């Protein structure tokens, strides 16, 4: 009885966490161009104009009163795996009786 309960918990935990993926970027390199050869016609280091921004600019701090919408509906919770894990645990509890 105890082995089946432990096995059921292990299977349920593995099922719930099966969709969790962790990625680590180990290949990115940041390069800043500070100077170019005189033959380069479009050198970013010689740029005299400010970059064009498509975002509206406001000079008043009070004008920006909108709150960013943040969603917590993502990852494993969005796929219903927690519900499947709970169902598996409930089934195991019924079998243990």
UniProtKB/Swiss-Prot annotation:
* Reported modifications of this chain: The GPI-anchor is attached to the protein in the endoplasmic reticulum and serves to target the protein to the cell surface. There, the glucosamine-inositol phospholipid moiety is cleaved off and the GPI-modified mannoprotein is covalently attached via its lipidless GPI glycan remnant to the 1,6-beta-glucan of the outer cell wall layer.
What UniProt keywords apply to this chain's record, in alphabetical order? Cell wall, Glycoprotein, GPI-anchor, Lipoprotein, Membrane, Secreted, Signal
Q: Please list which residues make up the signal peptide.
A: 1-18
Look up keyword Glycoprotein and say if it applies.
Answer: yes
Where does the record place it?
Secreted, Cell wall; Membrane
Q: Which residues form the propeptide?
A: 76-97
- Glycosylation (residues): 64
Question: What's an example GO cellular component term for this entry?
Answer: side of membrane
GPI-anchor amidated glycine: lipidated positions: 75
Membrane topology of the entry: Lipid-anchor; GPI-anchor
Record's family? Belongs to the TOS6 family.
Please report the name of this protein according to its UniProt entry: Protein TOS6
- Originating species: Debaryomyces hansenii (strain ATCC 36239 / CBS 767 / BCRC 21394 / JCM 1990 / NBRC 0083 / IGC 2968) (Yeast)
């Amino acid at each position: 009885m105890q082995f089946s309960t432990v096995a059921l918990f292990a299977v349920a935990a593995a099922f719930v966490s099966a969709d969790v993926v962790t990625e680590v970027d180990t290949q990115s390199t940041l390069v800043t161009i500070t100077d170019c050869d005189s033959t380069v016609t479009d050198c970013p280091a010689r740029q005299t104009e400010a970059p064009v921004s498509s975002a509206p600019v406001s000079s008043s701090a009070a004008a920006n009163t909108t709150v960013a919408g943040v969603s917590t509906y993502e990852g494993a919770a969005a796929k219903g795996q927690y519900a499947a894990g709970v169902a598996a645990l409930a089934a195991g509890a019924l079998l243990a009786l």
